[in-house]
Swiss-Prot record:
Residues 335-468 form the RanBD1 domain. GO terms for cellular component: nuclear envelope; nuclear membrane; nuclear pore; nucleoplasm. It comes from Homo sapiens (Human). Residues 76-304 are annotated as: 5 X 2 AA repeats of F-G. This is Nuclear pore complex protein Nup50. Keywords: Acetylation, Isopeptide bond, Membrane, mRNA transport, Nuclear pore complex, Nucleus, Phosphoprotein, Protein transport, Repeat, Translocation, Transport, Ubl conjugation. Residues 304-317 have a biased composition (Polar residues). Its main location: nucleus. The modification Phosphoserine is found at S52, S208, S221, S234, S270, S296. Sequence repeats lie at residues 76-77, 113-114, 225-226, 273-274, 303-304.
């Protein structure tokens, strides 16, 4: 919406004048009949969800979010979502059991787990024995059948059922309240009370319990994620649960592990909390060959069985002997490269020697042009006698060809002076000429030797030969 323009222009002439007072308007309320016909829009949030979905890396994952229906998990169960999680909820939120970590539970264990008397809590036993209280009257779950059979028995079964029901109700209550709670104290207390029950009733209760567990496992309905065989192999064993399987059951489990490997190429092992793992399980795990970043080569689906699994699969990476061999080959290649990449041979300069020279010295020759000295080249200075008893000054370049940089006769009137630290200055007509246009013009030449002693010696010889 555009701003309102100024009604009065402010200038240097009217800046001290007071503005006219404006009348303040009032709002008038519409009648109810008019308001009924109006469409009143209210602000609403576009994405209405749980508070846990507002942020975080796992905000899209809703498998552990507890809906307001009470005790039902949307991530498990049938597709309709009407069946509760088996073994964790009985359809009723029981709030009679206080938390394990409370001081009252530590002082009086009977309050947390119910009465530990021989008869047990009748309310919990009735709820467990009745399959209709498990949340689904038409399809009772296998855990309900197992608990009902466990409850119908001697006093050991009743106390064990009461203990399990109390643990289940406590877990369901507190997990629904806070899914991030720590359940470690539960199993420690469960271990303690289970040991007390077993001390009271001895081995008779354990033997009957193992038989009832076996019957319950046989009558268990198929699960949504796999067969009953996989569930039987991946059962949870808590620390302190001293149930002993019969030899026949051990033989059945061993034969199943040998003949029916897991669909993903590894032997399935049971989850053990605080209990020693059977050596047969470790042996079966160690017998599986390590494939190392490579999948099974058999033509099998994701959840199917692989017929070629027993064959060892070769790793895509080389082993240690191959690595050693590769290192040897690379060493040989490196040696060949080093031989090929040697430094290029240095150019050997064969100096052209003047046999009849009585004086030879390495020097650098300069010539003067435009009031500055320019380098002519590096070579060897030779002083040679001639037939007419004169001295020839010859400077050859240090190359294989031995190009002549300067070749003149020392005349008697040639200027020769000592300059600088190791320089000798002469004036002559250069041959070969420096400037072809002015070939007969004298040019100042500068001869630089290595040391000052060499310069003094050369200057002395030149003066002697010039005078001669």
């Amino acid at each position: 919406m555009a701003k309102r323009n100024a009604e009065k222009e402010l200038t240097d002439r009217n800046w001290d004048q007071e503005d006219e007072a404006e009348e303040v308007g009032t709002f008038s309320m519409a009648s109810e009949e008019v308001l009924k016909n109006r469409a009143i829009k209210k602000a609403k949030r576009r994405n209405v969800g749980f508070e846990s979905d507002t942020g975080g890396a796992f905000k899209g994952f809703k498998g552990l979010v507890v809906p307001s229906g009470g005790g039902r998990f949307s991530g498990f169960g049938s597709g309709a979502g009407g069946k509760p999680l088996e073994g964790l909820s009985n359809g009723n939120n029981i709030t009679s059991a206080p938390p394990f970590a409370s001081a009252k539970a530590a002082a009086d264990p009977k309050v947390a787990f119910g009465s530990l008397a021989a008869n047990g809590p009748t309310t919990l036993v009735d709820k467990v024995s009745n399959p209709k209280t498990n949340g689904d009257s038409q399809q009772p779950s296998s855990s309900g059948l197992a608990s009902s059979k466990a409850c119908v028995g001697n006093a050991y079964h009743k106390q064990l059922a009461a203990l399990n029901c109390s643990v289940r109700d406590w877990i369901v209550k507190h997990v629904n309240t806070n899914p991030l709670c720590d359940l470690t104290p539960i199993f420690k207390d469960y271990e303690k009370y289970l040991a007390n029950i077993e001390q009271q009733h001895g081995n008779s209760g354990r033997n009957s319990e193992s038989e009832s567990n076996k019957v319950a496992a046989e009558t268990q309905s198929p699960s949504l994620f796999g067969s009953t065989k996989l569930q039987q192999e991946s059962t949870f064993l808590f620390h302190g649960n001293k149930t002993e399987d019969t030899p026949d059951k051990k033989m059945e489990v061993a034969s199943e592990k040998k003949t029916d490997p897991s669909s993903l190429g590894a032997t399935s092992a049971s989850f053990n909390f605080g209990k020693k793992v059977d050596s047969s399980v470790l042996g079966s795990l160690s017998s599986v060959p390590l494939t190392g970043f490579s999948f099974s080569p058999g033509n099998s689906s994701l959840f199917g069985k692989d017929t070629t699994q027993s064959k060892p699969v070769s790793s895509p990476f080389p082993t240690k002997p191959l690595e050693g061999q590769a290192e040897g080959d690379s060493g040989e290649c490196k040696g060949g490269d080093e031989e090929e990449n040697d430094e290029p041979p240095k150019v050997v300069v064969t100096e052209v020697k003047e046999e009849d020279a009585f004086y030879s010295k390495k020097c650098k020759l300069f010539y003067k042009k435009d009031n500055e000295f320019k380098e002519k080249g590096i070579g060897t200075l030779h002083l040679k006698p001639t037939a007419n008893q004169k001295t020839q000054l010859l400077v050859r370049a240090d190359t294989n060809l031995g190009n002549i940089l300067l070749n003149v006769l020392i005349p008697p009137n040639m200027p020769c002076t000592r300059t600088g630290k190791n320089n000798v200055l002469i004036v002559c007509v250069p041959n070969p000429p420096i400037d072809e246009k002015n070939a007969t013009m004298p040019v100042t030449m500068l001869i630089r030797v290595k040391t000052s002693e060499d310069a003094d010696e050369l200057h002395k010889i030149l003066l002697e030969k010039k005078d001669a």
